[in-house]
Amino acid sequence: MMNSPATRYMLFSTGGVRYAVNVDYLDEISELLQEYPIPQAPRFLRGVVNIHGKLAAVFDLSLYVGTGPVKKGCNLLLLKMPETSLAIVVEQMERMIPGDEIVSIEQGAGPSGATTFILADGKAELLDAEHLVDSMENSFVA
């Protein structure tokens, strides 16, 4: 069940939008590291970073969804994915919440048509990490 106490989510915001990601997809949270650009990559793909000897693509989620580039003072959220290493640029880390803090769930209510969590202190759009990677890969093919 999505809102069981055993399921935990990390809350963060970027581009003026608040997100939640299941911690099962999180590998690490890091300060912004030296980025190396990728020639001819889309604007939302800022480059790659070296995290513990492993290269990860740096993804600007706010540029991707159209809310503008992230501001200064950012963190990286390194996602744990089976076939790729992806680091999302995040403007503000909030906190980790247990699933039972979710008051209600609205399907298809977020800015991107995603699931929205209603919390006691506001809303958060659920970030589907697998869907994000798939849609990012499809943007290279198009």
Residue ranges and their predicted role:
Residues 1-142:
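An acidic, low-aromatic, low-complexity terminal/linker signal
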